[in-house]
Amino acid sequence: GTMQEVQQTAKQLGVAVEVEGYLPRDTAAEELTVAAAKECVTNCIKHADGNEVYIRIAERNHCHDITITNNGRVPTGPIREGSGLSALRHSIESYGGEMHISHEPRFALLITIPAKENEL
């Protein structure tokens, strides 16, 4: 799917998805970003009871740096990775990227995906 589709679906569920920065032009990197966005929308609704998801995409050191947060309830402790997040981590790591989850001061999904040379 595309980021537009994620935004439309989220909107129907009452969640606004704000994207700052540009999606990676590389298909695989873009798909991973979209998958992460989708997962975060689901988690925002299911666990955090939030209605806004923020996605920040930046380019740094030949990598796409993606940070996803929401305005929902702050987690009370470390996030347990459910099947959605571990599947996402698996996809990102098999592409050579990294995924970190922080829960302080609020939930954040931090993803680094290597950029292909022709994208830079």
Question: What do the PLM-derived regions correspond to, one by one?
Answer:
Residues 1-15:
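Short beta-to-alpha transition helix within the HATPase_c
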Residues 30-53:
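Conserved ATP-binding N-box helix of the HATPase_c
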Residues 63, 73-74, 104-110:
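Glycine-rich nucleotide-binding loop
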Residues 14-22, 65-67, 99-102:
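Conserved transmitter core of two-component histidine kinases
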Residues 15-38, 79:
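Conserved short strand/loop->alpha-helix "switch" segment adjacent to the catalytic nucleotide/phosphoryl-transfer site
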Residues 52-62, 69:
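Short beta-strand/loop element within the Bergerat-fold HATPase_c
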Residues 58, 100-108, 114:
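A short beta-strand-to-loop micro-motif at the C-terminal edge of the catalytic HATPase_c
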Residues 77-105:
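ATP phosphate-binding glycine-rich loop and adjacent ATP-lid/helix-beta elements
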